[in-house]
Amino acid sequence: MASVWKRLQRVGKHASKFQFVASYQELMVECTKKWQPDKLVVVWTRRSRRKSSKAHSWQPGIKNPYRGVVVWPVPENIEITVTLFKDPHAEEFEDKEWTFVIENESPSGRRKALATSSINMKQYASPMPTQTDVKLKFKPLSKKVVSAALQFSLSCIFLREGKATDEDMQSLASLMSMKQADIGNLDDFEEDNEDDDENRVNQEEKAAKITEIVNQLNALSSLDEDQDDCIKQANMRSAKSASSSEELINKLNFLDEAEKDLATVNSNPFDDPDAAELNPFGDPDSEEPITETASPRKTEDSFYNNSYNPFKEVQTPQYLNPFDEPEAFVTIKDSPPQSTKRKNIRPVDMSKYLYADSSKTEEEELDESNPFYEPKSTPPPNNLVNPVQELETERRVKRKAPAPPVLSPKTGVLNENTVSAGKDLSTSPKPSPIPSPVLGRKPNASQSLLVWCKEVTKNYRGVKITNFTTSWRNGLSFCAILHHFRPDLIDYKSLNPQDIKENNKKAYDGFASIGISRLLEPSDMVLLAIPDKLTVMTYLYQIRAHFSGQELNVVQIEENSSKSTYKVGNYETDTNSSVDQEKFYAELSDLKREPELQQPISGAVDFLSQDDSVFVNDSGVGESESEHQTPDDHLSPSTASPYCRRTKSDTEPQKSQQSSGRTSGSDDPGICSNTDSTQAQVLLGKKRLLKAETLELSDLYVSDKKKDMSPPFICEETDEQKLQTLDIGSNLEKEKLENSRSLECRSDPESPIKKTSLSPTSKLGYSYSRDLDLAKKKHASLRQTESDPDADRTTLNHADHSSKIVQHRLLSRQEELKERARVLLEQARRDAALKAGNKHNTNTATPFCNRQLSDQQDEERRRQLRERARQLIAEARSGVKMSELPSYGEMAAEKLKERSKASGDENDNIEIDTNEEIPEGFVVGGGDELTNLENDLDTPEQNSKLVDLKLKKLLEVQPQVANSPSSAAQKAVTESSEQDMKSGTEDLRTERLQKTTERFRNPVVFSKDSTVRKTQLQSFSQYIENRPEMKRQRSIQEDTKKGNEEKAAITETQRKPSEDEVLNKGFKDTSQYVVGELAALENEQKQIDTRAALVEKRLRYLMDTGRNTEEEEAMMQEWFMLVNKKNALIRRMNQLSLLEKEHDLERRYELLNRELRAMLAIEDWQKTEAQKRREQLLLDELVALVNKRDALVRDLDAQEKQAEEEDEHLERTLEQNKGKMAKKEEKCVLQ
């Protein structure tokens, strides 16, 4: 089979087929003195294709007797057909070399290569018929040859062109060029569902084993001296075993029937149990199951009521519970009761082969009548499972792991898999027929894929999937999968199971139409009796990835492929991705009705689930996979999310047992065991709430009504009530953080970015509407200096200690926090009164309730809101942690402070002002946020945890270790803020604070990691910014419009602030910009191609040998990962191709404008050289586009004028002609 990766490389490329004709004219070969060739043959070859010339005798020359020449008096023509491929953007075809080999043919006919030379066929390819004279110099392969040369003419004729994946572009020879395929009679394999590529047993081996088995039977039956008939039967079998393997199988089938006849006559008691042993599941498989079962039973009872018969014990458990099949074999082999000599291993093996053949004949009968009814040929008893699947179980168990003790706990392994590989338990009562799909606590990629395929196709007639080879040959299985997900693309009922080529063609065309790379062709299945396993697996993996949302998309391309970033799913962080709000709100309302689990440990579990959803490449640069959970997906979040986590475990085989267990356990939606269902619900519910909670903040009154909470005027609560409530939330938060931190460290030691998710302080920074933040920034900064600085420094250092130290100090810090909160409340009141008096000349005793604030104060708040929005934009761009966190009002501040202290986070050096005074403008603009905080505090077991988890997801990859560059910058800014705030006057504080804000807007430290990952923030915040606002909120929204627009622009560019070629799914550009991205993609492809070639070679070797299952599994995981990356690159290149062909100038103009605005939003000093070049390219492109558009407008204008002139001319002409016609009519008179 041709290399799978080669086919994957050809996806999206153009192909042209050429016919080349070589006309040999003269061959010169110079030899050593001691040797001369007999006859020479020129072979033109590539891989397994060979085109040989006739043998010609070598004639020594006159001048140099060691140099001889072969001359063709009539040129000999050798023709080949070559398919050349090229990238849509490339000018020339890809390289394809054919080799000329000069061979010496001895008198005995033996050939030996003497010299070789290769030519690149693309150099001679031409769309027009051409003929080229070629003189090739050869490289000697033998010491006997000194030099060689060949003169010939090479003609090229262009045949046709098309897509590289078109069937007529595939060379039939190349389909089988990688290895010799096992080609047999297609009709035989049509009904054969037994063949598994890795478990093939050739006929000679089968014959030898059957002979051995027959001898064992002979010995077994000879033990009973009274049963002469059985001895004769065995002798008869023994004599027949010398014949060919095919004959043996037919004879043994006949003998099997003869044994059943003997059993009915009761002539041989051994035959009854033996027949049953040969076919332990004979009831459902035979044509008359009930009678056949009853007859041996009666005979057995009449002859053997004692336990003399060793097979009697086996039958009952096998019929009652097919899952006990391995234990039954254990009983036979390892723990025989009385007659040890009679209980031999061989009768079991006998059943293995004989039963295989009997099932095969039964399938043949069914196929000849109606193959669609193959799985339901006869109604089995209720307590029996599908006999064909059990057959496959029996075969695989015996071939793969013949030692029965290993197989006996199979049921237990399957139960364990409910957690570690939940996909393996389908909703049907049958377990996976293959031994445990978990190898070394890692999910078995191939087995989980097989189970997925079975699950998807389980109700389709004519489909029975047991392997990755013959089960797929007639195309019905592929068609069933396509019909399951896209019934509009294929009419399954109209398919003919005998039409292999047409079935496969319909399936492959359907998958290609929805963007799945085409790796198989109908001719593969027609020509190859046993399709290539790796190709089928890879194709199926692509199909599963597509329909389950596991497809990767390019985020950022680096020079080194291992550092490039991909994300799972097709979620767009682009603000123009236009998520349907109706869908989003509908989903939100559904989520709010879901019950929430309140165990504190579930918080830690959910932390782990969030960590698992971060896709980490080899370099550890992460991207949140939760981005792909949009309502636009055809899968619901509950479906997409587990698949997201599944991919993580696929790509990182070194995952811990707990992590891999959960990820694979939720791999297939709705298929969970009892032990895992609760956990899965927690994970799904929490994960979905992460997305929905952001919208919940905007439902000002809706959230109040749903949760029966108090109105959004927080000042009505007393300080003591608040602090008590905060204490409850704080305790829960501490416990949760401790659990999550310890579990998280164990979860994935490879990822350096995951420990950054534990700062609730920084999380809250982006949780609520940005419009609130700046309003109380002054209070926050002032309270920083007046709070206890020693405790703050201790807290900062505390972040570097282990979680154990945090736990020891939690109780003492609780009391400290309470006291500090009370002090801050008093200070907040005094500060608010002072500020109101100084700035607005209002009453010095400003009331503490929202309703009494002046209009001037509202204006000041709005101005501060705009300032805060700009600051947040700068923070998001720079990766600096939020040293000056927003004041959300008393509840938010206190809650934030409690959480921060409880978690031992470094941001504890920031104190939040808890001024009870909340201006009316704030309730108008952000009352929903405050209300939501209040709701959180009233139900701390639920909402505080969920809000915190949501915020963790938003900022989970932001570096937060105390010694990181970004945190160092934050510390510096915070300390400078503290110094500034110690001055006495309010005006000076305001001035200094503005300077601090400017520092945020022009940050000193630029964190590369954060630039890659910060886009997740906007994927949630855009819904807040674009949500339907309440009427009272619009005034503030208008004021902050400019800030929001700037944020949207920054969002678009955050993926590519410091890289040469960064791929932004939200942007499309033309011309030079496209060329630059394509260059980066091609570089990435080359690196992936190099690695994939090695992986495929090694994987094929491991699959053929089957020696190292763990390495094979690791290679399989890496292979699937590479395939997924390759498909992501293919999709990106297709997008760029479409964009390049975009001839709509208006659309191009909009796209260019959009990209340019995003570029210009970055400060000049922050731009790299690459970004400056790209910006210049965009400007040039835009200017050229404007010029083109102007030229078009002028042309159109000229054309319109010309058209008007022509219309006028036509009108004049018509009027003149009309007058002439009228005159003629007047002259016409009837006579």
From Swiss-Prot:
It comes from the Eukaryota. PROSITE patterns: BMERB, C2_NT, CH. Residues 185-210, 808-879, 1076-1100, 1136-1230 form a coiled coil. Residues 8-158 form the C2 NT-type domain. Its main location: cytoplasm. The modification Phosphoserine is found at residues 171, 174, 177, 222, 302, 307, 335, 408, 426, 428, 432, 436, 636, 710, 781, 854, 964, 1058. Residues 264-318, 358-440, 616-675, 737-764, 777-800, 837-865, 895-941, 960-996, 1025-1065, 1198-1231 are annotated as: Disordered. It is found in: Cytoplasm; Membrane; Endosome. Transmembrane segments: none annotated. Residues 905-919 have a biased composition (Acidic residues). Residues 443-548 form the Calponin-homology (CH) domain. One of its GO terms (cellular component) is plasma membrane. A motif (CAAX motif) lies at residues 1228-1231. Residues 302-318, 654-675, 754-764, 839-849, 960-976 have a biased composition (Polar residues). The keyword Lipid metabolism does not apply. InterPro entries: bMERB_dom (IPR022735), CH_dom (IPR001715), CH_dom_sf (IPR036872), F-actin_Monoox_Mical (IPR050540), NT-C2 (IPR019448). The modification Phosphothreonine is found at T694. Interacts with EHD1. Interacts with EHD2. Interacts with RAB8A, RAB10, RAB13 and RAB15 (in their GTP-bound forms); at least in case of RAB8A may bind 2 molecules of RAB8A simultaneously through a high and a low affinity binding site, respectively. May play a role in actin reorganization. Links clathrin-mediated endocytosis to the actin cytoskeleton. May act as Rab effector protein and play a role in vesicle trafficking. Required for perinuclear sorting and insulin-regulated recycling of SLC2A4/GLUT4 in adipocytes. PANTHER family: CALPONIN HOMOLOGY DOMAIN-CONTAINING PROTEIN DDB_G0272472-RELATED, EH DOMAIN-BINDING PROTEIN 1. It is linked to Prostate cancer, hereditary, 12: A condition associated with familial predisposition to cancer of the prostate. Most prostate cancers are adenocarcinomas that develop in the acini of the prostatic ducts. Other rare histopathologic types of prostate cancer that occur in approximately 5% of patients include small cell carcinoma, mucinous carcinoma, prostatic ductal carcinoma, transitional cell carcinoma, squamous cell carcinoma, basal cell carcinoma, adenoid cystic carcinoma (basaloid), signet-ring cell carcinoma and neuroendocrine carcinoma. This is EH domain-binding protein 1. The lineage of its organism: Eukaryota, Metazoa, Chordata, Craniata, Vertebrata.
